């Protein structure tokens, strides 16, 4: 039997995975395990290996705060979003389509988190892809933002048919206890230009492949592309893409869609609804990981707040286990004062 609880106006259902036929479509029901040690964070004691780094990752397009959405305007949605985030309390969160004032308000209402974000560009309205992380567990080693264009290092630059600047914000995070590092990339691709989406995923995967250390990584974002589209197939390593002046290009590190790893045949996968109950069957949002990462669970959350949604997209949540990286591989993550002593080889 489903039991319903209320938390400051939030409505969510509690069910175990075994009780749910369609695990992607219940309200506030992310409860993959029966034992919960912290709201929104599952205990991995019986399911995950004792080694490696276990993470709870969320991706969420929160809709730009200046949109004239009536009862779904940001001033009404702000509390819904913050209650959702505080309820699930992800280790790392990738937000898309966030304006500066939205990031500032979320930072205030989300205690214990720090964020990595692109710098402001004078005279340009930038929809940020901000990365929030649990500051009690992680510290920020590196961060950056590049712009999907022929001049990716120039803030505000556009290209390939983008009607507005499109970015990727990335961060290298270090877990304080294990001192294990990983990269986190967060993107929002153009919604109109197919050429832009193709060029963007090729540039993105080449950028990831050239990262300065062999740490594992997570990729989140709104790709504005369905599961059968060429950019998504490219990311999964299923097809190459033909790029001008480059010919056919393949993804050097094929990725897994964390939701499809767990639910390969589920049909209820839409993540964009446009505030409609009978929403479009379109899924532009993903959390990707390389094959070395273990996917423990994944969900598309369908939250309601007094008959209203927090955003025009549904958030995604996944539980993953990152592989162990040797101490020598992680050594470069720290300053000289922070570097742990490496044991001599036998």
Predicted regions mapped to residue ranges:
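N-terminal, active-site-proximal structural segment of metallo-dependent hydrolase catalytic domains
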Residues: 2-109, 120-127, 322-346
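Metal-dependent phosphoester-hydrolase catalytic domains
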Residues: 6-47, 137, 195, 206-217, ...
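Structured beta-strand-rich core segments of catalytic domains in phosphoester-bond hydrolases
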Residues: 16-17, 21-49, 92-185, 189, ...
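A generic structural micro-feature
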Residues: 52, 124, 160-165, 278-280, ...
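Active-site beta-strand/loop signature of hydrolases that rely on acidic residues for catalysis
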Residues: 56-62, 81-106, 132, 171, ...
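Short catalytic/ligand-binding loop motif for oxyanion handling, primarily in non-cytosolic enzymes
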Residues: 65-68, 101-104, 123-128, 141, ...
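Short, solvent-exposed loop/turn segments at secondary-structure boundaries
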Residues: 69-73, 158, 194-198
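Glycine-rich, phosphate-binding/catalytic loops in enzymes
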Residues: 74-76, 109-112, 201-203, 234-238, ...
């Amino acid at each position: 039997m489903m039991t319903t609880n209320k938390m400051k106006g939030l409505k969510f259902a509690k069910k175990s995975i075994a009780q749910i036929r369609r695990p992607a479509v219940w309200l506030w029901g992310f409860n993959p395990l029966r034992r919960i040690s912290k709201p929104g964070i599952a205990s991995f004691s019986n399911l995950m290996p004792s080694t490696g780094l276990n993470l709870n990752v969320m991706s969420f397009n929160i809709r730009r705060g200046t949109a004239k959405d009536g009862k779904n305007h940001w001033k009404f949605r702000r509390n819904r979003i913050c209650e959702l985030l505080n309820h699930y309390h992800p280790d790392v969160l990738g937000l898309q389509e966030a304006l500066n004032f939205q990031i500032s308000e979320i930072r205030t209402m989300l205690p214990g988190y720090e964020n990595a974000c692109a710098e402001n560009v004078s005279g340009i309205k930038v929809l940020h892809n901000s990365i929030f992380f649990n500051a009690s567990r992680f510290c920020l080693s590196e961060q950056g933002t590049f712009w999907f264009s022929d001049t990716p290092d120039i803030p505000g630059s556009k290209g390939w048919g983008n009607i507005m600047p499109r970015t990727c914000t990335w961060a290298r995070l270090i877990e304080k206890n294990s001192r294990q590092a990983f990269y986190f990339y967060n993107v929002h691709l153009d919604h109109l230009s197919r050429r832009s989406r193709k060029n963007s995923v090729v540039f993105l995967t080449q950028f990831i492949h050239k990262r300065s250390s062999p740490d594992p990584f997570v990729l989140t974002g709104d790709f504005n592309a369905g599961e059968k589209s060429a950019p998504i197939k490219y990311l999964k390593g299923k097809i190459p893409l033909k790029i001008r002046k480059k010919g056919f290009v393949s993804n050097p590190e094929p990725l897994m869609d964390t939701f499809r790893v767990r639910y390969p045949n589920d049909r209820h996968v839409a993540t964009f609804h446009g505030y409609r109950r009978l929403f479009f069957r379109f899924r532009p949002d993903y959390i990707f990981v390389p094959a070395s990462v273990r996917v423990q669970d994944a969900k598309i959350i369908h939250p309601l707040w007094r008959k209203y949604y927090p955003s025009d997209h549904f958030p995604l949540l996944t539980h993953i286990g990152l592989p162990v990286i040797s101490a020598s591989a992680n050594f470069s993550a720290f300053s000289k004062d922070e570097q742990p002593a490496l044991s001599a080889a036998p």
